[in-house]
Amino acid sequence: MERPKFIASCSFGKDSLATILLAKEHGEPLDEAVYCEVMFDKGISGEVPEHRDFIYNTAIPALERMGVKIIVLRSEKTYVDLFTGRVTRGPKKGMVRSFPLCGKCAVQRDCKIRPIQRYQKNLPPGTVQYIGIAQDEQERLLRLESGRQVSLLAKYNFTEQDAWQLCEKAGLLSPVYAFTDRGGCWFCPNAKLPELRHLYDHHPDLWARMLELQAIPGKATEKFNRTQKFSDIDVLFRQEDGKAALRQAA
């Protein structure tokens, strides 16, 4: 009887990379690692640029040298496609869809979950999926589907800090951890202010694209997140810079 297929879900964050490193270290079966890249538009990744560079220039080559097959998935739809689409029913019918809702993200649904679901439909019955959930994330571990989803981090008693250290030792810790403790698209409405400040300071071209989208008329919502327009955040950072300049001049 053939063994089931084993795949690893990989965002190239510390937990999913540590899972793959543990699989290789302990001889756990692993047929391929699967990564879904959300795109801002047809040419620009939704990954924070430092993380995308790490994925393609460091992590994927390193894993391939270890013999890990990498599958990269992408949706035909992009963030800009969804943003500029039109509402088709209800009181806002005909308006530009605009920013995704926090907690009900159409980008997550259409650009990430659906490509993964299409991939999973072609997997053989009984496929086992390694999920990067650490030993100290008990609530998330309890939600794993028994037999079909496995945490190697829990199996080998690895906490999130252990995962960090394993990746760091292997030279596979993403540079995004220098300014955030979470993964996510650079246009995510759940992004914290330090993440947005990093985008503002280091990637003004991407920041400008978001301001261009904010300026589109006839949107179903003006809010980037639960409380602010993207232009409000832009004003906030400009004011911070102005105050800092005054302090330096004093």
Residue positions per predicted region:
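Nucleotide-activated chemistry modules centered on ATP-dependent adenylation/adenylyltransferase
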Residues: M1-A250
